[in-house]
């Protein structure tokens, strides 16, 4: 399940589809805006004001008709997301703000669902694989962090989230297949 279809989630979803991951879930509530184009490679100028999750579902299904692409056009919330998350083996945290990331962290802990966190800001990116109750969780890394430090306020160089999103897809493929050691496993 890819949660967030922006700069991280767009390339992550594309690579999961290209790899033939049987079922790719997509969750986002946003629409395409002109400010997205420098880093969100699934969308085009003609897509402005259209649902990101529906556009991504259409594109990924055309790209690889052998996979199932499930779309959840909704905002992340503990009430609605847990039932969706439990349907998947791994979640990719492709969100763009700490508050939502920490909410996803808690839902994944509650459902015991492994997740691959990715983040990018300015010229920097990070990624880690979190297996609930086998090591630290995302809140352990950011117990006193400020919610003021997010992409909307700080900006991000377009290729940075692309690189991190591709790494998240690679980690998800390794996790699902059991091949190799996860990079940055917490």
Each language-model region and where it sits:
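Adenine nucleotide-associated cytosolic modules
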Residues: 1-185
